[in-house]
Amino acid sequence: MSHTHHPRPCPIPVVVATLLAAFFCSTEPTRAQSSADAPQRSIRVELPGQEQNAIKNSWPGISCWFMTAPDFEPDGFKRFIDLHSSHSGAGLLTTSIRHNVEVTQPAVHDQIKRAAVYARDHGLGVVMDLDVRLARQAFMSKYPDEMQELVCLREIPLTSSGEVTLSIPSIELSDHYTPGASGVRPYGTLSTRLLAAYSAVEGADGIDPSTIQDISSRCRILQADTNCLRVAIPTLPADAGRKAFILAAFTLFSPDVFAPHLIEFERAILKQYADVPLAGACKDEWGFPGRFAPRLDDLYFTPAMALEYAHRRPGHDLARDLLLMIKPQLGREPERAAAINHYMEMNWQRNAAVENAFYDSIKQVFGPRAMAATHPTWFPHPETREEVFKNGLHWWAARRDLAQTDEVTPFSVRTALAKKSHSPIWMNMFYDGNLATYSGELWRHALGGGRINFHPVYPPGANSPTDYLTTSLLHGNLMTADCRIRLLNFISTAPIDCPVAIIFGHPAALNWAGPGLADTGLKIANALWEQGFYADLIPSSEISSKNLKLATDGSIQYGPQHYAAALLHHPQYERPALATFFRKAAALRRTALYRTGEWTRDFEGRTFDGATALAGMKSLSPEAAAGEIISHLKSLGLQPQTTCTKRDGGFPGSMMPLPSGQCRLLDGTVILASGATDVMGDPIQKTIQIASHPVRFDAVGIAAIRLDKSGKVDALAAGALRSLSAGDLQIELTSPVDLALWHDSHGHWQGVLQGWDGPIPEPLARITTHWARLRLPAPVDQSPR
């Protein structure tokens, strides 16, 4: 079983609670029946400094489980759980369904309950995906008028006589929730309607707004079904030189993001599973149905969205404003910018509201310490149109206790989300088609302040075994190496230190009327990370939500991070209140302030003198910004961390740490990690200086230490430790040991030995008798250690 280890001032560490007790306040902890000397497969310890987080304990390992048809056979779930209980160090399974069933079906509920009970009894907690997208048919049956629409604007020249016809093909979208190979229905077209039709004169610079006419009533519907919308328009002599602009609305097999009953329906799903011993619930990659290479003349729309838009902008009609957003109109550039600003802000705020309602429901149904999973990122890069139109870059506003991302999300985003969540680490769901890639990623993640949520190898090779998705990560030493790295979790109480904030203009990054669409300043962040000066990437909307704020010492602060420097990128279309924030920051002079990009219009499209409003910020070109900031950081005596290399392939490039180097956490922990040549780690025989105190390590893979203000050791973690010299703490071991050692809240030493048989080594027993033991998983063809 997996247990929670509660340090206390007693001669023997007490290991208490099942996984449920670790997450659910409603479940009382129970004393383990086994001896304290018996190795456990997972241990969680209470961490200091977690007042801002609902989760007070260290995080266990996390792996993905995708339930397919075999898992829904009687006892079919046991194979995956048995394998991962024996051959991984995971304590949690973020679990979703890749099968043609819905979570609202009683038989599915019952199978998931059996699986969750079995997993719990084998030391694993199931965090189940209970998103509405796994119950689309049930939602549509109950609320048939609350499905998502996508409006496609297409145009055709009109003639002076006769009739013109235009056919607009239907839409079919899909993602990981709609695996076609498993027979799951895509986000296909359910029905089609003509939303509106306009005619106007359009020149090279845009439509002449004085010529716009609503010609919806002139249109004759020839076909409106799941295949297309086809309309005929009788023409008139006055139509010569004009164009028709047809807005076709396709209703998709997906709930409307703005559906009035969406949040209520998802809450009911969670309540349906209240009797299941889940460790939490997942909502993965939420947003509108994702579109690859999205067109700027296709925009999401529903009557519920139109109502919200009218509420935000009295006197404005969303259907009419869609024409303005898509097609520039002469002399209406400010109005167009404002319409897009409101539309996109409305969208990302609604996506965040749905996410946060789901978070609240998880806590209400499963308890305050239940896990809210997984990641809000989809096409995981802030500088892609795919992500912009999927969710409006709402990532920072989606509440989590553990910062979570996926795939190749830039490290500057991962670290920022850790600050927002007040989580000591971030977790990134990673996959690749090559198993060898995971080895380097494991160490890169650690040096960037994070860990991997292990997604199976994907896509599997053509000749892979049928159960490769189940077993692909359990061969070799990958899982064992992850256990070594996760020794850091016992002593990491705060996220990685990033002294720079790159604050990108959220409106500009979402607005295609200006030059800043999908430009979040990542190139500047990359240039900083490349040199080892880490930066958090944060949207400007976090200022208006009062999450990015001025600290009591006058510095700009995000979660636990105080910034030595902050750069505002592309403030175009911001509200004037943003300037007030930076004027106050400039007056306090605790954070160096920089700006890239012009600010000539505010959120409503009105003329704005940003240069004067931001006079306290040094204006730089994007090319010069990183160098200027690095010079300032060096003048403060700040040292770089692990340098980075660029990741390319499939997404805009972003920086990732080398697999060998050094980083520092905000709690003062210094981490050395090295895994460039061996997945289990490379030798670390090194002396470092921490505030003039020398520390010498002889270890493998990881060597981490935190000193108190007097220079005494407060916590340490190391792989295959042979020796440590740090002030009055001297350790010399005849055999290498994986260990973590820390002071509990009473000031007493507590420790964990991993993969160690036999008596506690005498040098360690002299430090404390409070040692717990962790079992090491063995590769799938070996026995556990």
Sequence positions of predicted segments:
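Bacterial N-terminal signal peptides
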Residues: P13-C25
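Compositionally biased, intrinsically disordered or flexible polar/acidic segments
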Residues: C10, F24-P29, T596
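Mature N-terminal, pre-catalytic/accessory segment of carbohydrate-active enzymes
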Residues: S26-P289, S361, C498, H632, ...
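Carbohydrate-binding surfaces of carbohydrate-active enzymes
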Residues: A38, D71-E73, K78, L92, ...
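N-terminal compositionally biased, intrinsically disordered segments and leader/signal-like regions
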Residues: H5, L19, E28-R31
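N-terminal secretory signal peptides that target proteins for export/translocation
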Residues: M1-C10
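Extracellular/secretory pathway and lumenal proteins
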Residues: V14, P29-T30, G675-A676
